[in-house]
Regions:
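C-terminal motif of bacterial Sec signal peptides marking the signal peptidase cleavage site
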Residues: 4-5
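Short, conserved catalytic or interaction motifs in soluble domains
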Residues: 8
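Non-catalytic cap/lid and distal C-terminal segments of serine-dependent acyl enzymes
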Residues: 15, 19, 31-283
């Protein structure tokens, strides 16, 4: 490849006058960085909680305990500190569906949605064999050693006695009182609904007189004015008073029957919620 150079002959010099732009200048836009948008958190508007049915394995009973678990509307599995929670035990010859049938969880939905009570978790286990008392049955041990740890490991519940309650109706109330006074370091609140106590259970209540005041559970007792076990319930209340146990006793119109308990499930929830608030404020 050859490069050939050519030169112009007798050419006139070319003037080098700079060109001037006479057009109107346009404003120059400077890019402005866009602000990072913060995602708007989703607002939960649910008005109903959810009910789970789970089988919790137990070593004491060598079988599982079928358990209904109520999670409140807008349940947050990562809630800081966890929800206060309540174990509710059914009566003799019934199942763990009893509290559902009485309307307990429907009442919880209404009271939580209206902000009358704080959201809480409710645990309703099934006692299959209900004939033995605490000396013969290991149901109480299974609750303490298997059910309670399972709930605290798998659900967003508070792990302090001030936000842990146990209650029940009739025989279930017997278990609640038994566990509440045998393990006052675990449960800060006990509910006994239409509850004549297990034989010998008054001794555990009398023993509470020697506990520091902050270690004694708050107790709710109620019964119908026509309850066939009313006298035994009154003996229970007298024992609480003599032992210096903080309690509230309500006598409503009614008998020892489902229509009585269903009429007062909202009252029970209000009381448990107030008790949680009281214990938390005293910490």
């Amino acid at each position: 490849l050859f490069l050939v150079s050519c030169a112009a002959v007798n050419s006139s010099p070319i003037s080098t006058v700079a060109a001037t732009d006479t057009s109107t200048p346009h404003p120059t836009s400077t890019p402005v960085p866009q602000a990072t948008r913060t995602p708007t958190p989703l607002v939960c508007t649910a008005t109903q909680g959810s009910i789970l049915n789970v089988d919790i394995p137990t070593q004491k009973l060598n079988r599982s305990i079928n358990t209904n678990i109520y999670l409140p509307p807008c349940y947050d599995p990562k809630k800081e500190g966890g929800y206060p929670w309540l174990i509710m035990l059914h009566g003799q010859a019934a199942t763990n569906a009893q509290w559902l049938e009485l309307g307990l969880t429907n009442a919880a939905d209404d009271l939580i949605t209206s902000k009358e009570i704080q959201p809480l978790v409710i645990v309703m286990p099934f006692e299959v064999t209900w004939t033995p008392g605490p000396r013969e049955s290991q149901f109480d041990e299974a609750l303490m050693e298997d059910v309670l740890p399972h709930i605290e490991e798998n659900y967003a519940v508070c792990k302090e006695r001030t936000c842990r309650a146990i209650g029940g109706l009739s025989r279930g109330g017997n278990w609640a009182v038994h566990l509440g006074f045998v393990s006052p370091e675990v449960f800060g609140i006990v509910g006994a609904h239409s509850t004549p106590l297990f034989y010998g259970e008054l001794w555990n209540i009398q023993a509470a007189a020697g506990l520091p005041p902050e270690s004694i559970p708050l107790v709710l007792v109620d019964a119908g004015d026509k309850d066939a076990e009313k006298e035994k319930v009154q003996e229970f209340v007298t024992a609480l008073k003599d032992a210096g146990v903080p309690y509230q006793f309500f006598e409503f119109e009614g008998r020892h029957e489902p229509s009585y308990w269903s009429a007062h499930v909202a009252d029970y929830l209000r009381w448990y919620a107030q008790a949680f608030t009281r214990l938390q404020s005293e910490k």
